Amino acid sequence: MEIRNAIVDAMFCIIYKKKALTWKTGIERRTECNLPTSNMAAQRRNLMQSHQSWTDDLPLCQLCGVGTAPNCMYGTDGKDTQSHPNEDTHLRFRSEDGCSLYGVFNGYDGSRVASFASQCLTAELLLEQLSADHSDTDVRRILTQAFEAVEKSYLHTIDDALAEKANLSGYMLPHSEKVQERLKELEQEVSGGATAIVALILNNKLYVANVGTNRALLCKTTTDGQNQFFQLGRPHNTDNDDELKRLAALGLDSARVRQAGQIAGQSSTRRLGDYRVKINYNDIDLLSAGKTRPIIAEPEIHGSQSLDSVTGFLLLMSEGLIDALECAHGPEHVNKEIVAMVAAELAQQTTLEAAAQSVVDRVKRLHHDVYTSGRQRATFCSRHEDMTLLVRTLNYPLADGVLTPTQAGGRIYPVSVPYSNSQSTSKTSVTLSLVMPSQSTLTNGTNTASTLEEGTPTPGGWSRCRRRRNFWTRQPCI
C-alpha cells in the first residue's frame, strides 16, 4: 500500500531523472530525486502547469492514429473562433512486454485534470504492474486501483490551495480587492475535471475502462463474413438508469437528477477531479442528501474480450466528437456513421494518423455545414467542444499501395452516409465506396446495417442531446 500511495511521487521523480527503470520505496525515491516529502505536492502542481511530461520518452503504438480538432464557436458570418484552450488529451503507448494502453480524456474548466490523469494513469499501468500471468480478475482490479490512485493523487495536489482558499474565504475583509484576486487565482488552480475512456490490450485481450461520457466502439469482421460494431458500455450521465439507481441508493432524488440533466454544469455522473462535487458535494443542492460522495471516479470495466484472429478496429472518442455529430444529424445513427467514415478513410489514407484526422475534419465540416445551412438544426450547431478520435487497427490493412483491403480479398460496398447540403432544406445521403477487408456487410452487433444501431442503444435519445447542451442553446434539440 505504501508503494501504491507513492506511485505518483515516482512519476515526478522520473521527470527530473528522465529515466526510471525500477520502482523503489517512497523514501528511496524522494532521496534519489532530491525532493523533500513536504515539497512533493508543489512539484506536482508545477508539473501540471508545464508542458513537460515523463511520458514523452515512452514508445508510441504504431498501430494507432489520433485525430483532433479544437473547440470553436461560429460567428454570424460562419467563421469559427476558438472559445478556450484545448482541454482534451490522449495516450497511446506500447510497452516492451507487449502491453498496450490507449486513452482519451475530455477535460473541462481547463486541461489540468485531463493532463494529470493521462500521465498518472500511464505510470500506474505501464511500469511493470501488469504481467502476462495476470488473470482477468487481476487486470480489472489493477485498472480500478489505478483510477483510484489517480483520483486520490490529484485531489492531494490541490490540498494546499483548497486550505488557503478556505482560510481566505473566512478572512475578516473578504471583500478586499487583493483577497478577491487571490481567491480567483486559487479557484482557477483547483477547478476542473475530466472524463476518461481507456483501453488496455494485454495477452491479446481487450479491456475498456470508462469514467464519464466518452465512448468506445469495437468493429470486427466475424467468422460468417459480417463486419459488426459494438458500443462497449454506456455513458455515465443523468439518463443512465443504472447510474440513477446508484444515486438513489445514496439518498439522492433520482427524478430530480434526471430532470436537471446536469450536475454542477456537467451531465456526467462519474468524473475525475472536480473538487466541487467530491469535497464540497454537500453544498450542491442536488447532491446534498448523499450519504457519501455521489459523483465518483470508479471506472466501469468491460472485458476481457479476446482479439485472437480479429480483423477490424477499435475507436475511442471524446464527448465533443460525439456531440458534434449528434447535433448535426441526431443521436440515432452516430455509431454507424463514425464506423463508416473510419472504414472509408482507412481504405483511402496511407497512414493511421491521416485516417483519424480526416474523420475528425469531416465531422467538423458536417457540423459547420449544418450551421451555415440556415435550417432548423442550425440553432443547435452554433459551437462545438474539443474533438478527439483514436483509431487502433486490429489486423486491418491500410491503402498503402502494398497491401490494401481489396488486395487482401475484400470487396467494395456502397454505404449511405447522411450529408448536409447548405442548399437543401433536409438531410440527404451520399453513397461512399466502403472497402472492407473481407466479403462482408457492415452490421451493428448481430443485426444488419438496416437495423440502425438496435444493438447499441443511446440512452434517452433526443432528451440526452437536449440536456447535455441546454447550457448552449436553452432549447430542445429536435
Regions found by a protein language model. Name each.
Residues 1-478:
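PP2C/PPM-type serine/threonine phosphatase catalytic domain
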